[in-house]
Amino acid sequence: MFKRTHYDIVICGAGPAGSMAALALKKSGLHVALTDAATFPRDKICGDSVSSVNKRILREVNPELETDLLDFSAKSNITQARLFSPEFRALQVSFKKTGHCIRRIDFDNWLFQHARQSGCDVYENARLKEIEPNDKGYTLTYTNGNKINASVVIGCDGAHSVVAKKLAGFKVDKHHYSGAVRQYYKNVAGNDGNTLEVYFLKDYLPGYFWIFPLSDNTANVGFGMLSQTIADNKIDLKKSIHRIIHNIPQVAERFKDATPLEQPIGFGLPLGSKKYRISGNRFMLCGDAASLIDPFSGEGIETAMESGKFAAEQAVNCFAANRFDAEFMYGYDERVYKKMWPNFRNHYLLQRILGNRTRLINTLIRVGNIPWVNKQIPKLFY
């Protein structure tokens, strides 16, 4: 199966984090393998929001990537967001830079195909089963029995990361984890195609319901809550989203002529509200595998791509210095958290303060319509 028995770097997972790492290693001169359990194109349950920051990250790696994304046809252009309080008062905020909504099956495949052309060896349908240390790095064993050796492993294998569990001992912490469901709909009324919509609903806090517009008059509709709240209250997210869409008049009116394109599908979000050790001897974790999802917005594509880029650059430094020990590798952790922790910390504080405080959320939505306050709100999204 594998072209080589040993690689300088094996990237486990070819989503935004892994593909970006591969792209950033294009000119490194290192032997790189990019592996994924799936065969592309494949779906990834998500809100499908691609912020303007993602374009900056693409530009830093290769300006042609940003240009190619702008020419991508299957996207909506996002210029604003509309937030609804529990009393259904609306707050509209405009973004200085245009973001996009793109189905993950399309966006991830687009990025993956660029990574495939970066010069790395790509292996699809390669599901990691075990990872064990050896005298030159790690031996990775896949479910089909094939093995590969790596000097450095970059774990980009998502919320249920094998690399994170085996090498960093990660376990789910429900206080820093969210559950959500997504359901695609056609013909949802009332959205002009360029607005992210978020509802804070009285009986469904702490959490929010969203309607994000895609191309072709399709919408990504979803609902998410903290996992600890879900467990404590025995909440069924699939039943909850059904009740929201059909039983809340202000929402149901928008869905009376809409058609569901699938059943609700659940997914987990490891939040960046808690710091972890995301590297060690000869390995790094990126994106969802490193719990780098924004604790308030649930945005994870941007941080996945940036952490993938950072990991690639750290790996190059490791080979240049011939140092792969945990102390040297910790430079990756420091860079990631220097960039991301201020937002994570502030957004986690906001998440905790708002909680299920209906009156407070109502008040903040009202205050948000004050012009100088309104200008600060886009930072929660893009």
Locations of the language-model features?
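Glycine-rich FAD pyrophosphate-binding loop
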Residues: 26-46
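Conserved hydrophobic helix-helix packing surfaces used for dimerization/oligomerization
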Residues: 9-11, 32, 283
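C-terminal helical "tail/cap" subdomain of flavin- and related membrane-associated enzymes
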Residues: 313-382
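Predominantly flavin-linked oxidoreductase catalytic cores and closely associated redox partners
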Residues: 114-251
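Beta1/beta-strand and adjacent pyrophosphate-binding region of the FAD-binding site
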Residues: 2-17
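FAD/FMN-dependent oxidoreductases across multiple families
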Residues: 130, 147, 229-311, 318
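Conserved Rossmann-like nucleotide-cofactor binding loop
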Residues: 17, 40, 160
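A conserved beta-strand/loop capping segment in the N-terminal third of enzymes
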Residues: 60-110
